[in-house]
């Protein structure tokens, strides 16, 4: 079986973190935010925001346009219809839940044992593994509820918001 490992934005795969999540990476997940450092390794680049659609590029004004343009031809973007469906469920989805929703829509399932590193913005957890507790604009409770429905295969309320 092919193992796909998605890492977000300014991830690190240093030996310090090897026991937590290993060193491999197959996909770089980025929204091309201004504070995201460019990568030179030839990862498959995926963007869980539809930044290839002008109205969404305008909505996410923090986008580094130069980096986006440099990667436009090689980046796979979330299909806009998936993102718009997600917006009916979660008004301001994180890139993490956007990616998981995208995978779920494409495959029809989501395996909890293969998803690592999501805290759903639990206030007792760090926002990211590398920083301090931060205020968050995302709705962790809604994201967690959607995640649980996806891993449990419960599509009744997901498909009928």
What does each model-found stretch correspond to?
Residues 1-161:
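Metal-ion/cofactor- or nucleotide/acyl-coenzyme-handling active-site neighborhoods
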């Amino acid at each position: 079986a092919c193992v796909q490992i998605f890492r977000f934005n300014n991830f690190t795969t240093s030996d310090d973190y090897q026991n937590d999540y290993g060193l491999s990476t197959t996909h770089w997940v980025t929204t091309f935010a201004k504070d995201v450092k460019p990568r030179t390794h030839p990862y498959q680049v995926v963007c869980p925001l539809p930044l290839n659609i002008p109205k969404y590029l305008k909505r996410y004004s923090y986008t580094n346009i130069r980096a986006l343009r440099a990667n436009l031809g090689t980046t796979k973007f979330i299909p806009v219809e998936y993102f718009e469906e997600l917006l009916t469920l979660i008004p301001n989805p994180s890139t993490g839940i956007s990616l998981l929703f995208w995978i779920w829509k494409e495959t029809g399932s989501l395996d909890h044992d293969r998803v690592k590193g999501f805290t759903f913005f639990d206030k007792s957890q760090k926002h990211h593994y590398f920083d301090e507790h931060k205020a968050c604009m995302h709705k962790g409770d809604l994201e967690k509820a959607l995640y649980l429905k996806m891993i449990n295969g419960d599509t009744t309320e997901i498909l009928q918001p």
